[in-house]
Amino acid sequence: MVKIGLFCAAGFSTGMLVNNMKIAAQASGVEAEIEAFSQSKLADYAPNIDVALLGPQVAYTLDKSKEICDKCDVPIAVIPMMDYGMLDGKKVLDLVLSLISG
């Protein structure tokens, strides 16, 4: 089971993407727990997730967010704007899988 946290400005705008990622995970046979949170809560959730993704609207926080995630050995990346805008759950799930595989 991979625990994935998506972090955006308020934790709401990623809701539809989370649903599409859950559908993609189920279709691919990937056991995943995927939730959306406000970026301001990253430090609270980082110890309990396997991968963190930032929404494009909070990409400016990547350096600070990476410091938080590095302390917990959690890989982090910014969701590509195109994948985010198209709500492409499969591509974002593929990004997660690439982060945890190496």
Predicted segments, located by residue:
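Conserved active-site segments centered on acidic
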Residues: 2-39
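Short, well-ordered alpha-helices that flank and scaffold nucleotide-derived cofactor binding pockets
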Residues: 19, 23-26, 67, 94, ...
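Generic structural signal for helix capping and beta-alpha/helix-loop junctions
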Residues: 42-44, 86
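Short acidic/histidine-rich motifs immediately flanking catalytic phosphotransfer sites
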Residues: 46-52
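Short glycine-rich anion-binding loops that position phosphate/pyrophosphate groups of nucleotides
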Residues: 57-59
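A short, gly/pro- and small-residue-rich
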Residues: 61-81
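Ser/Thr/Gly-rich flexible loops in soluble cytosolic domains mediating phosphotransfer, phosphorylation
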Residues: 75-102
